[in-house]
């Protein structure tokens, strides 16, 4: 369950940012997660609640913004949506795609006191 590890890393980032900005409490965390990242959002939410107990992020809202997958076809050069790895180009049917979006995993913003 790598969601638990991800939440530990998120809390480390929160602590770093909060310490540098002299924050007392984190009220909301906004994550950007690419559609192609293998993250179970329910497990991530559960892990976040567990990991943040006793920290400045305890009871913080976790908001997840999903970034759709997108690729450029190496054959026809069209930008196409990508729902999973090894999708084919919706324009020409080629499987040679270069991923441009969908693998993001970052803390986008925090609301703090």
UniProtKB/Swiss-Prot annotation:
Assigned keywords, A-Z: Metal-binding, Nickel, Zinc
Residues given in the record as Zn(2+) binding sites: 73, 76, 89, 92
Pfam families: HypA (PF01155)
Transmembrane segments: none
Record GO terms (molecular function): nickel cation binding; zinc ion binding
Keyword Zinc (UniProt): yes
Biological process per Gene Ontology, one example term: protein modification process
PROSITE patterns hit by this protein: HYPA
Residues where Ni(2+) binds: 2
Superkingdom in the source lineage: Bacteria
Alphabetized HAMAP family for the sequence: HypA_HybF
Record family assignment: Belongs to the HypA/HybF family.
Function: Involved in the maturation of [NiFe] hydrogenases. Required for nickel insertion into the metal center of the hydrogenase.
UniProt name for this protein: Hydrogenase maturation factor HypA
Species annotation: Legionella pneumophila subsp. pneumophila (strain Philadelphia 1 / ATCC 33152 / DSM 7513)
Classification lineage: Bacteria, Pseudomonadati, Pseudomonadota, Gammaproteobacteria, Legionellales
Gene: hypA
């Amino acid at each position: 369950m790598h969601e638990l590890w991800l939440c530990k890393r998120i809390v480390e980032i929160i602590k770093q940012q909060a310490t540098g900005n002299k924050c007392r409490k984190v009220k909301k965390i906004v994550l950007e997660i690419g559609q192609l990242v293998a993250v179970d959002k329910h497990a991530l939410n559960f892990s976040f609640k567990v990991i943040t107990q006793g920290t400045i992020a305890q009871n913080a809202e976790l908001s997840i913004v999903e970034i759709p997958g997108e690729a450029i076809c190496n054959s026809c050069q069209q930008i196409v949506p990508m729902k999973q790895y090894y999708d084919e180009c919706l324009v020409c049917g080629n499987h040679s795609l270069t991923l441009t979006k969908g693998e993001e995993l970052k803390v986008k913003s925090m609301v703090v006191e």
